[in-house]
Design a protein with these regions (language model features):
Chain A
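Formylglycine-dependent sulfatase
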Residues: 2-428, 437-476, 480-511
Length: 511, 511
């Protein structure tokens, strides 16, 4: 039987006892954070090895320069403006799922694990969910079979009066809280969470291999997200400081996971993809922030530094070693690609933005498709081929900037990294990302090259806008009452807290 | 017999018929221009392969952020402030050898080929010499046996009245001039010079192999120096535009040269080093300028973008494949390393700044040594370990900057990329290049880390300054009469021009 059903084969193992599995690594890291992508301290031997054995994507994008919307896009294959992971509280404002958010992933969305489940997959998420923390948004209600991790970011510590510490779940119930039961030392940066997440991954893989069940593992760790942390054995080991320590621990973990797959003899049956949910947060640099290599700005922006991501596909025996692809890729493609590997069809009742990358990965094809750069409710920029047109520019407001909040530290391109929202709808700013990957030299409006490229891109925009049906925005309303006061399982632990009265209001999204 | 005399063995081949040879590639390219260093279009498969088979240096420096002084430093193993390749016409001004320069490499300097000659080497320079073009500075008077290339930059075309076109030499005599006999089409960027230089290299290597003579080949090409050029077959083939076309042609040439060594069976007897004489000239970006990856600014500055260079050592069978070194290295080390390979001692009557890198390359050792960043006559900055202290900062003057001359386009770090020369002697600006490779976040003066690091670096500076004997500055005087009016051999070609009367004056160095 054809082994093409590699990743997401239906039901039980094939006659050949092929185990068909998939793993996605997702974390907050910049394009320039890996040795294979030119990080000058070159401290990621395992990821570099993964790249050498697999395929490196140099033009791979997230769907949004912020965590929650990107993750929602990955799991639904749809832009945040469709799946509801955006806000209309302000123009072009980024929004995510802090613990006072009321919204989350709508039931109407079909998530990758829900679809894979029908094909017999056991799905596990390890790490940060970030698609809403109220009961109806729980990952096990959206296709995952297992979960170990947290619903929100590991911010804290909180005082349990104004704000409870974020819970950590095992499956349906919480098993403790960050800073209380799962320590993060903000002074030293020590926390053993990555080790816990690693062990979870290894155990899950072993279990699936033993039971010969195909699996989908979504390893969504967050050690490189501020507050950055690393285990004791990695603290102080990097040239890059605490952030580098965290990267090294993740690199080590990836090596151990890939090695585990090989030891168990299932590496040729496991499609693994490594990428990030947004660019490095330069606002946290250098202590807690990574590198976007030669690209402009970082997280929160629709410049390349905010949305171009490191990406590696690994599947020994199928993907030729050492491959390099210039395919314009998106995290949303992982949705479509996984379905394709499973022999499943994507849902036909809705627009799917992801494309099937298998022809790219297995046959080296290049598929012509645009990349849309959204910030909240606004289409800020579009890339087609090597051209990128900005229809709106801004980094953040003067007000924020004057307080020292800087998404582009050390970088300033006049008229480009603007601190007011500037519209360029009628004369978009155009860059050639081959000659000018750093978006520093807008093409002359008068040039023929400009006119040809903009004409093409504007056609794509028109088509996109004409067919766009925005989803109900999920990230508009906040309410202290919905915070993690009494998550399921809190009673057993004596960790239930009293919620304040409900007082829903518009969330404030400053940038 | 021990094969340790690999590179520069004395006299004729050993009993084992070992041919001991060396090649240095030197060109104007930025740290971030190679795929192996994270260039996002990854168009250098041959150089990346060279790195995979050899050792990648991530912390390798040139001796000056400008061409002539760097090349003089490489060939003498000495800082430009010692060998005379600097100016005292203005404080901290860069200077080089345009065709009206009066000075050049002093006879008192001992060049690498002069020393190797004594050990039986045949030495050839292909490409740009740049150590002075008046008769006494001719490369064949300084140890080279053969030359094909030009004494100065390929600027032009000139009108032969105000300024003659730069000659191209074969050995002692000119064989034509740029733009006249060696075409460079400034409109299309077409020129077949790299192909000529490639063929010269292949022929020279073949000849040396046939005669079993050890050789030193210095392949100092200049296609990536503005005006950037490429051969017809490479024009339009790069994502990166003309600059990328030139890089691709160089990459292809390097591949052909390494392949030739392998075909001839002498790759294991040939130590090859690839590096650059200064960072990418961002002032020429994006059309004619490369990338310095994550580093600050470019050519002309003493920020990392101006002086940290791509560097690869290749020596199959000796250097373990895939090695990566964090050794602080310098182009001046190529002088000392080559002598060491030849079993020769460096001259003992003068200060040599280069160190022998063999323990690093062959045994993976790390040698503690500082890097001094000079701009003209001023020590601007010093690196020790991961710390870099700036004693002076400036990019260029406000006057130049206001005319659009920008060495840091899109980059601006307050108080760092200054447009006045700012002295920090008593409180140097300190950066940790591991956590902050982009030199964007100066350490707090009050921190213990600052005090410890600056104390150490200041000790190194004191020691360096106390023993420094500056050479007679060679780049102070310019005179139209010394231009390439009638280079040797011009009579045979009918290409002699009449020189104007001598009118020496101080050269003007704007930055």
């Amino acid at each position: 039987m054809c082994n093409f059903l590699f990743l997401l084969a239906l039901g039980v193992p094939q006659a050949s006892e092929t185990l068909t599995s998939s793993g996605v690594f997702l974390l907050q890291m910049g394009w320039g954070d890996l040795g294979a992508f030119g990080e000058p301290s070159k401290e990621t031997p395992n990821l570099d090895q993964m790249a050498a054995e697999g395929m490196l994507f140099l033009d791979f994008y997230t769907a949004n320069p912020l965590c929650s919307p990107s993750r929602a896009a990955l799991l639904t294959g749809r832009l945040p403006v469709r799946n509801g992971f955006y806000t209309t509280n302000g123009h072009a404002r980024n929004a995510y799922t802090p613990q006072d958010i009321v919204g989350g992933i709508p039931d109407s969305e079909l998530l990758l694990p829900e679809l894979l489940k029908k094909a017999g997959y056991i799905n596990k998420i390890i790490g940060k969910w970030h698609l809403g923390h109220r009961p109806q948004f729980h990952p096990l209600k959206h296709g995952f079979d297992e979960w170990f991790g947290s619903p929100n970011c590991h911010f804290g510590p909180y005082d349990s009066r104004e704000r409870p510490n974020i819970p950590v779940y095992r499956d349906w119930e919480m098993v403790g809280r960050y800073y209380e039961d799962f320590k993060i030392d903000l002074k030293t940066g020590e926390a053993n969470l990555t080790q816990l997440y690693l062990q979870e991954a290894l155990d899950f893989i072993s279990k699936q291999q033993a039971s010969q069940q195909p699996f989908f593992l979504y390893w969504a760790i967050d050690a490189t997200h501020a507050p950055v942390y690393a285990s004791k054995q990695f603290l102080g080991t990097s040239q890059r400081g605490l952030y580098g320590d965290a990267v090294r621990e993740i690199d080590d973990s990836v090596g151990k996971i890939l090695n585990h797959l090989q030891q168990l003899g299932i590496s040729e049956n496991t499609f693994v993809f490594f990428t990030s949910d947004n660019g490095a947060a330069l606002i946290s640099a250098p202590k807690q922030g990574g590198s976007n290599g030669p690209f402009l700005c970082g997280k929160q922006t629709t410049f390349e530094g905010g949305m171009r991501e490191p990406a590696i596909a690994w599947w020994p025996g199928h993907i030729p070693a050492g491959g390099v692809s210039h395919q314009l890729g998106s995290v949303m493609d992982l949705f479509s690609t996984s379905l394709s590997l499973a022999g499943l069809q994507p849902p036909s009742d809705r627009q799917i933005d992801g494309i099937d990358l298998l022809p790219v990965i297995l046959q080296g094809k290049l598929i012509d498709r645009p990349i849309f750069y959204y910030r909240g409710n606004e289409l800020m920029a579009v890339r087609a081929g090597l051209y990128k047109a900005h229809y709106w520019t801004w980094s953040n407001s003067w007000e924020e900037h004057s307080k020292g909040i800087d998404f582009c530290p050390g970088q300033s391109v006049s008229g480009v990294t603007t601190h007011t929202q500037e519209e360029h709808t009628y004369l978009p700013l155009l860059f050639h990302l081959g000659r000018d990957p750093g978006e520093k030299f807008p093409l002359s409006f008068a040039s023929e090259e400009y006119q040809q490229a903009v004409e093409r891109i504007s056609g794509l925009v028109q088509q996109h806008r004409a067919t766009l049906v925005p989803g109900q925005p999920q990230l508009n309303v906040c309410d202290q009452a919905v915070m993690n006061w009494s998550p399921p399982g809190c009673e057993k632990l004596g960790k239930c807290l009293k919620a304040p009265e409900s007082d829903p209001k518009k969330c404030s999204w400053p940038h």
